[in-house]
A protein has these predicted regions:
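Conserved metal-binding segment of the jelly-roll/cupin
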Residues: 100-120, 232-253, 260-262
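A short glycine-rich, His/Asp/Glu-containing loop-to-beta-strand
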Residues: 36-69, 162-205
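Acidic, low-complexity central loop/insert segments
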Residues: 86-134
Length: 280
């Protein structure tokens, strides 16, 4: 197996609005998440969130404590949320073992223990997407499925944004330190998410897009309300959203995305909305 990581530094909005396409993609887009028998991570300075993925194919992959953590184990001072977006898989955390099927999630609390990822079938490997944030205390591990989620049906087909927001690793379902994760599924014929757009200056966010055909693409919108920029993305890619930025998208096909947040509070409704007509 191989572990890869890179560090992404935070950007000031006054600086970011002058970035060209190459710089925007370099600083905010995470293109390489799933590579066979690799664990790939981005250590972000936005609330020190780690965004990554593991794709075990015939091997057991270990979640290694990367150097920026300066810790004996990855979870020594961190909590983690994991979603399986591939075939059936297994996550082991210390003496605990969790089986995760497609679109099932797992919360891991902080503590000194080894974490491993494996697939049940190498021909249909699991794909583990994860977000991790610093944690001030330990909360119990827990597997969460859509049956456990707080579900909000939003939008309409006429507005091209009919979707179900599955709040899964949130404080309405289980205790966490600062991590909040969920999964939004867009209905056929709907392509817009998070519109009208909003920001939440108390929390940063990361979006991971999947369930989009290979010959289609997603256009993610970011930036300040009066200085928006776009990032064209493919499936199985993620994007960082600073606390000062909107985070919205439209695509050429319906899709699903996983959102993860961390920061000052755990209030999902703490959002500052903008009028669609104010966007520039």
């Amino acid at each position: 197996m191989k572990t890869n990581y890179e560090i992404r530094y935070a950007a000031h909005p006054e600086d970011a609005k002058s970035y060209d396409t190459t710089r925007i993609r370099r600083d905010f887009l995470i293109e390489k998440i799933f590579v066979p028998n690799e664990v790939n991570m981005v250590y972000s300075m936005y609330d020190r969130m780690v965004v990554g993925g593991a794709l075990p194919v015939g091997e057991v992959l270990t979640l290694e404590a990367i150097d920026p953590l300066k810790a004996p184990f990855f979870l020594t001072r961190r909590e983690m949320g994991i979603y399986n977006v591939g075939g059936p898989g297994i996550v082991k955390a210390g003496d605990a073992e969790f089986e995760l099927d497609y679109k099932e999630a797992l919360y891991l609390g902080s503590g000194d223990r080894e974490v491993t990822f494996e697939s049940k079938d190498a021909a249909h490997p699991a794909k583990f997407y994860f977000n991790s944030l610093t944690a001030h205390r330990n909360y119990p591990d827990r597997k969460v499925t859509k049956a456990d989620a707080v579900v909000a049906e939003m939008g309409s087909l006429e507005g091209s944004n009919h979707r179900n927001i599955n709040k899964m690793l949130v404080n309405q379902v289980l205790p966490t330190c600062q991590l909040q994760m969920g999964m939004t599924e867009l209905a056929p014929g709907s392509v817009w998410n998070t519109m009208p757009a909003h920001v939440h200056s108390r929390r940063m966010e990361a979006y991971f897009y999947f369930e989009i055909p290979e010959d289609h693409a997603i256009c993610h919108f970011m930036g300040e309300v009066g200085e928006t920029r776009h990032v064209w993305m493919k499936g199985d890619q993620a994007v960082l959203s600073p606390e000062w930025s909107i985070h919205s998208a439209a695509a050429t096909h319906n899709y699903t995305f996983i959102w993860g947040m961390g920061g000052e509070n755990l209030d999902y409704g703490d959002q500052d909305f903008s009028l669609i007509t104010d966007l520039k």
